Amino acid sequence: MTTVFDIPADIFNPALAKAMADHDAVSMPDWAGYVKTAVDRERPPAQADWWYARSAAILRKIARNGPIGVTHLAQAFGGKKDNGAMPNTPGVASRHIIRTSLQQLEEAGLVEKVPTKVVEGEDGPVQLYAGRRITAAGQKLVNGVAHSVREETESMYPGLDKY
């Protein structure tokens, strides 16, 4: 069976974005046409379906590296912030975009929070989480997409047929 580990991201992510858009698992918010995706960007994305592509990339990262949190995802999707005459520093992606996408993926039943421990807060006990991991339904979707693009991947990368 082909899994997410067998398919490169440049083939897998567009196919997963198309599957998620068809599946109605994710929907683009109204404000998504006006926001930048990171602090190092100057303008909003030019693609009309960028929300689905970002959600697919987030789901792929969770499937490969889960449990994973919002901060780690923001660092992974960030770039280099231009500081003028000063050296460039790492720029993080928008955490609001990542959180909203994760909330939509949770409502669709594709990812879930991983509880770690309960600590005592000012208002009583507070549940802490280690991040999010993929659910069985999410794994089924990801593996189904990976299996559907296997032939295209083998034609583009002939060495992958060994795996």
Question: Residue ranges of each PLM-predicted region?
Answer:
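Long, low-complexity, charged/polar intrinsically disordered regions in eukaryotic proteins
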Residues: 1-56, 60
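Short amphipathic alpha-helical elements of helix-turn-helix/winged-helix folds
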Residues: 57-65, 76, 101
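Short acidic, hydrophobic short linear motifs in intrinsically disordered regions
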Residues: 67-89
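Basic amphipathic alpha-helical segments that dock to polyanions
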Residues: 73, 98-108
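Residue-level detection of the helix-turn-helix DNA-binding "recognition helix"
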Residues: 78, 103, 143, 147
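A short, conserved structural fragment
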Residues: 106-123
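Short, amphipathic alpha-helical interaction segments positioned at domain boundaries
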Residues: 122-163
